[in-house]
From Swiss-Prot:
A motif (PPxY motif) lies at residues 97-101. The modification Phosphotyrosine is found at residue 112. This is Latent membrane protein 2. It comes from Epstein-Barr virus (strain AG876) (HHV-4). The lineage of its organism: Viruses, Duplodnaviria, Heunggongvirae, Peploviricota, Herviviricetes. In healthy individuals, EBV typically establishes a persistent latent infection in which the virus can be detected in resting, nonproliferating peripheral B-lymphocytes. These latently infected cells express only 2 virally encoded genes, LMP2A and EBNA1. One of its GO terms (biological process) is viral latency. Keywords: Host cell membrane, Host cytoplasm, Host membrane, Host-virus interaction, Membrane, Modulation of host E3 ubiquitin ligases by virus, Modulation of host ubiquitin pathway by virus, Phosphoprotein, Transmembrane, Transmembrane helix, Ubl conjugation.
Amino acid sequence: MGSLEMVPMGAGPPSPGGDPDGDDGGNNSQYPSASGSSGNTPTPPNDEERESNEEPPPPYEDPYWGNGDRHSDYQPLGTQDQSLYLGLQHDGNDGLPPPPYSPRDDSSQHIYEEAGRGSMNPVCLPVIVAPYLFWLAAIAASCFTASVSTVVTATGLALSLLLLAAVASSYAAAQRKLLTPVTVLTAVVTFFAICLTWRIEDPPFNSLLFALLAAAGGLQGIYVLVMLVLLILAYRRRWRRLTVCGGIMFLACVLVLIVDAVLQLSPLLGAVTVVSMTLLLLAFVLWLSSPGGLGTLGAALLTLAAALALLASLILGTLNLTTMFLLMLLWTLVVLLICSSCSSCPLSKILLARLFLYALALLLLASALIAGGSILQTNFKSLSSTEFIPNLFCMLLLIVAGILFILAILTEWGSGNRTYGPVFMCLGGLLTMVAGAVWLTVMTNTLLSAWILTAGFLIFLIGFALFGVIRCCRYCCYYCLTLESEERPPTPYRNTV
């Protein structure tokens, strides 16, 4: 019987599952080797030595080789719901999940990772090209009535946007995305370019031109609606219900802006409509890049800026019920975005404080822009050639300050970087102060000029506070620099073991 218990030399390791009789084959490897023993038959260890030398199995073997006592809730692969693996039916594995710890390829990150979808087919080219064809046909029909420069400008704009639409479509297909913000932006810009062509080519005298442009605008409007619906459906699992409501409200704002642009024939209101539409598009792209948290707060700030632009149109222009309704929609959208973002942010108090400071700076800058526009509009007819250049220079400084503020919002709330946003705000405050100081020097409407100077100073202080007083003290204060430069006394090493 002793010969039956001998382990032949050179034999391989036993299988981890053991013998069919129930003997644990892994315990044979704990016997001493034949070369190290004095006899041919090694002495098996007793129960205490066997328990002390026994090593626990690897973590990944425990669920699969266990007896079911410790893992009673573990469900074998054969009894799992087959609907979990419907996406793997055509992978040559008969719809079963891939075996554990044998990834399908080098790019697999999980043992049950579904096979990635192939590259998407690009968006149907006839759907993209159709409105552009109607648009180009309308431009060709206007050759007998419109000027050469108008026809050349409209044709170049149409071809450029058609090329941009093709690039956006190929980008969406290469990135395996159903829709991208670039595609939405291109479609909306195309729609407004068609409306602009309708305005500059005097269509009431040409019924064919009117029909072609109306067909092009209608097709592009339907395309925008379909893309937004597909975008909501594609991200319905990741986006919250409030975010989807925000997208629907954004679409309502776009429609109301179109109505406002059609009804208002004032150049001032047209320019303000273009500014507010640009801010809304930037807010929409920023919101798409980060549906929750910082991106949503930045979108709320840009939407608030668009609402202030429309409010400026109410102050400088005529009262319009459509614009008032749009302001209510934008204000509701701002509240929804702030509530949806702060509910998911752990540092909601800090973010709300920074949002409040940014909103306060936005109000100050908007008031400075309105005051500058009032100064320029009041003194435009009575200005001489020597006074026109300083006024235009100050107004350009205020416009650059507004652009810097938008860059600050996009930098901080889009990327989360808290350094460059306050720096841009400080620069905008300095430019506003320079504009107010120049207007105050030439004694042009002293009260408004003093307010512009004060608003610029307050914006600079807000940017300085957002940058951080402690950070500025650390970078500029001599005492703080001295403290940081001092070497700490070395602590003796004590071995207390």
